[in-house]
A protein has these predicted regions:
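Helix C-cap/alpha-to-beta connector motif
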Residues: 84-87
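Pre-Walker A (Motif I) flank of P-loop NTPase domains
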Residues: 53-57, 91-93
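Phosphate-binding/switch region of NTP-binding enzymes
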Residues: 58-59, 64, 68-69, 157, ...
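N-terminal pre-Walker A segment at the start of P-loop NTPase domains
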Residues: 20-46
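Conserved inter-motif catalytic segment of the P-loop NTP-binding fold
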Residues: 34-35, 42, 47, 89-175, ...
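Hydrophobic positions on the alpha1 helix immediately C-terminal to the Walker A/P-loop
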Residues: 70, 74
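Short, small/acidic-rich helices and loops at N termini and domain boundaries
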Residues: 1-25
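Gly/Ala-rich phosphate-binding loop of Rossmann-like dinucleotide-binding domains
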Residues: 79
């Protein structure tokens, strides 16, 4: 017996669309009226006033600007519950995915950062490093492997440095970069942790561009993250360098006076302690010839050299909230 006709789909494509429609795993729409009086709590801060747990942050800057050092310092600050760029960090476990440095150089950098910051390495167990130099794969293939390895580690942040090693597709294509950035959302959602990554500036002058437009490639890079920090180098003026040299000379002179002639506080005013000329003259009178010679010939030239080696940077932040 013929029961009925024209009750199915006209083609395989229609059947495929129907199956996908009934089996999708997307959440259902919700009415705002039902949650108006019982709004969910905001995610807790990971970096105070900058980034929340479970959110994404991009650090952009010119090549060889020290982005990796900044991210390693951030890992250490999260592990120790310290400060990063004067922002307090929530203490917790962090995974640093190293795609660029060789293993030895990467591990040495962590110790160098601890030493330079003067931090006691009390919570090194909070830092895990996944060295993937030479083993990079596109992000859409890396994300499932990353989620599987990090699933039970209770990380509150995953740092990926840098992303150009794992970009899927053309970085200038908006739709391809949208698919690429969706992988970060997948990691955030599956693991409940923040994802922090860095990218380089485009070629050419950056001064005329907004901070959001400096990252190389599609504008998706600027629109996708919840927080965007952009590093731009400043050119110190000669006047500023001389001012910093004056401070450095004063610091060296005062260090020698505290060590060899503590009674200097009775002779020098606060204004005198800010003048390198006054302090050098005072040291010449009060310190012995050998000590003064060591100060003038060794300590002060070294202090001046350290000042001349400094670079100046501005960090511009663009936050979604």
């Amino acid at each position: 017996f013929l029961v009925d006709t024209n009750i199915g789909k006209a083609s395989f494509l229609e059947w495929q669309e129907w199956i996908e429609a009934v089996n999708d795993d997307l959440p259902e729409p919700e009415s705002i009226s039902e949650i108006w009086d019982n709004l969910p709590e905001l995610a807790k801060p990971l970096i105070d006033n900058v980034l929340r747990q479970g959110h994404k942050m991009l650090i952009a800057g010119p090549s060889k600007a020290g982005k990796s050092y900044a991210l390693i310092e951030l890992c250490c600050a999260i592990a120790e519950g310290g400060q990063w760029l004067n922002f307090s960090c929530t203490k917790g476990k962090v995974l640093y995915v190293n795609l660029e440095l060789d293993r030895a150089s990467c591990l040495h950098r962590f110790k160098d950062v601890y030493t330079a910051m003067g931090w006691e390495p009390s919570n090194l167990s909070n830092i895990d490093v996944w060295n993937l130099r030479g083993k990079s794969i596109p992000m859409d293939k890396l994300a499932p492997k990353l989620i599987r390895r990090a699933a039970k580690k209770n990380y509150i942040a995953i740092v990926i440095d840098p992303i150009y090693k794992i970009i899927t597709g053309d970085e200038n294509s908006a739709d391809q970069m949208a698919h690429f950035c969706n992988q970060f959302d997948k990691v955030c959602t599956e693991l409940g942790c923040a994802v922090i990554y860095c990218h380089h500036h485009s070629k050419g002058g950056q001064g005329s561009k907004k901070s959001m437009d400096r990252a190389s490639g599609s504008g998706v890079f600027a629109r996708d993250p919840d927080a965007l920090l952009d590093l731009i180098e400043l050119e110190p003026t000669e006047e500023l360098l001389k001012q910093e040299e004056n401070k450095a000379i004063c610091a060296e002179c005062l260090a020698y006076l505290k060590r060899y002639y503590p009674a200097y506080t009775q002779d020098l005013s606060q204004d005198d302690e800010l003048s390198s000329a006054v302090l050098l003259d005072y040291c010449h009178k009060m310190l012995g010839n050998n000590i003064n010679l060591e100060l003038v010939k060794t300590a002060i030239p070294a202090a001046k050299q350290r000042v001349r080696q400094r670079t100046a940077w501005r960090i511009e932040g663009t936050l979604r909230e």
